Amino acid sequence: ISDDIQSIIQGIF
């Protein structure tokens, strides 16, 4: 789950 959050953040940036 933690990786999913970071993946979304990187996708935005």
From Swiss-Prot:
Its main location: secreted. This is Venom peptide 8. Expressed by the venom gland. It is found in: Secreted. One of its GO terms (cellular component) is extracellular region. Keywords: Secreted. It comes from Brotheas amazonicus.
